[in-house]
């Protein structure tokens, strides 16, 4: 059973977060291992396995990038374990420039202002790519969606680096 079906949701990129959370809580209550403490060992083990599946499914569907990766896996794309080489040199050059810019921000006297502006631009890039990806999923252009997911992974990693730098600047 796929994760969407587990939560009674349609297989779509856009997910109602509130509905996902409420169904997650209901399934957690239903399959919580403590409810099976007095049951035979086989039932207890099945409950533990089901609880783990529910948790994994929720984590995959809750995060937009993980959800996209999971949806692609349903269509035969394993973007987590592939050795795919990014062929979009313009995108790769842009990533190098963004990383250099982020590295330079920490040395600036107005680092907090510069980082805020950088984070805003990065967020706009992520929103734009997510919009493209949404269209690609809706149109079932899986190869294009996989390419967009690969690009979003670069941006997601850059977003994590922005958050790390924000923490460093707060500690100064």
From Swiss-Prot:
Which CDD domains does its entry note? DnaJ (cd06257)
Per the record, what is one GO cellular component? iron-sulfur cluster transfer complex
Keywords linked to the UniProt accession: Chaperone
**InterPro entries (alphabetical):** DnaJ_domain, HscB, HscB_C_sf, HscB_oligo_C, J_dom_sf
Domain of life where this protein originates:
Bacteria
Q: Which Pfam families does the UniProt record give?
A: HSCB_C
Subunit structure of this entry? Interacts with HscA and stimulates its ATPase activity. Interacts with IscU.
Protein name, UniProt field: Co-chaperone protein HscB
